[in-house]
Amino acid sequence: MFFSRKIRSLLLTPKRRWSLILTLCLIFTGINFSTSNDVQASRIKDIAQLHGVRSNQLIGYGLITGLNGTGDDMKKSAFTLQAIYNMMTRSGITLNPSEMKSIKIKNVAAVMVTASLPPFASSGSKIDIQVSSMGDAKSLAGGTLLMTPLKGVDNRVYAIAQGPLAIGAFSFGGKSAQAQKNHPNAGRIPDGATVEDTVLVDIGADGTLTYQLANADFTTANNMTRAINKKFGKDTAYPLDSGSVTINIPPHFSKRVVQFVANVESIDITADSVARVVVNERTGTVVMGQNVRLSTVAVSHGNLNLIIRESFDVSQPAPLADGETVITPSTEISVTEEEGQLVVLNMKNDVSIGEIANALNAIGATPRDLIAIFQAIKAAGAMHGELIVL
């Protein structure tokens, strides 16, 4: 019996390697395979956020009731039993603490409730909540969350949550089999909490607004400042650093701050960024910015093959002999490496990495081929930009 298995084949085949070399030569001698590199403008509201206008996280501890025997095991979840006792006491029902341990309840589960309080949320408005099991409940399907206060980091109650839970999952089974779809121990309640208290946000109280860039960059901050000053007048805006721009509210907008903010956020500007290539060899993902440039470099790309052959020899004793049949495995390993071709890529002008990617995709180069080439070019100092390997 003979088994042959090819374990791994890395990099390019000879035919694709020659196509790769030819394509790189054409690129670096001036042929443009890319589409238009026109820079797209972005609104200020899409790349920056007004300082102080943000959401706040809320959290609470509550009980889910009405479960079909899939709740917490009271013998293992002491906090669930304690929560039930506290709830019954607040409802005016007197229970003997010593008898609580003998009570068997299977339709109740302890849960953590989280929510995000949006900015400018007013009292009485509704927000979505997320519910997740805290104990050993098998499923929260069909349960109803009892009234649960949601607090902020200052321990103040900002919302009250209650309502039937929607999980979009199920889990059923017995002792020998079980069927489950999605995750039955977490779910959501749309509009499940009512806002009771608000977080005060007074924008422009000191006559200024500060915008924080999502991606700090000196060029983007400068472009944003110039665009605002062009529309509202000189010295209206000035950059604090690479990530912040401060705007002086004009006197005629002092009573119309909301209108001024809307006008500012609708301005189109050109956002800049650091030239960067991000690769993930585990998934074969390559993400690159259009500003990455390459200089003159020599590239050699070879082909490596690793072949492992396994065979089994059978040793059988003679008739009537005192022995047993023995199977002996035999492994043969061979490694072949084809010679890589060295080509000098000499350019008069820098070529973008996007042009190289488009050309390589046209000849069928895989993302892992690009990763190997880009890593080598970066190590040679010919890539002008960051190479990030995840």
Curated annotation (Swiss-Prot):
GO biological process: bacterial-type flagellum-dependent cell motility
Keyword list, A-Z: Bacterial flagellum, Periplasm, Signal
Subunit and interaction comment: The basal body constitutes a major portion of the flagellar organelle and consists of four rings (L,P,S, and M) mounted on a central rod.
PANTHER family referenced in this protein's UniProt entry, alphabetically: FLAGELLAR P-RING PERIPLASMIC PROTEIN FLGI, FLAGELLAR P-RING PROTEIN
Coiled coil: none
One cellular component term from this protein's GO annotations in UniProt: bacterial-type flagellum basal body, distal rod, P ring
Location in the cell: Periplasm; Bacterial flagellum basal body
A Pfam entry, by short name: FlgI
Family statement drawn from the similarity comment of this UniProt entry: Belongs to the FlgI family.
Function, in words: Assembles around the rod to form the L-ring and probably protects the motor/basal body from shearing forces during rotation.
HAMAP family: FlgI
Principal subcellular localization: periplasm
GO MF term set: structural molecule activity
Name assigned to this protein: Flagellar P-ring protein
InterPro entries linked to this entry: Flag_FlgI
Signal peptide residue numbers: 1-36
Entry keyword Manganese: no
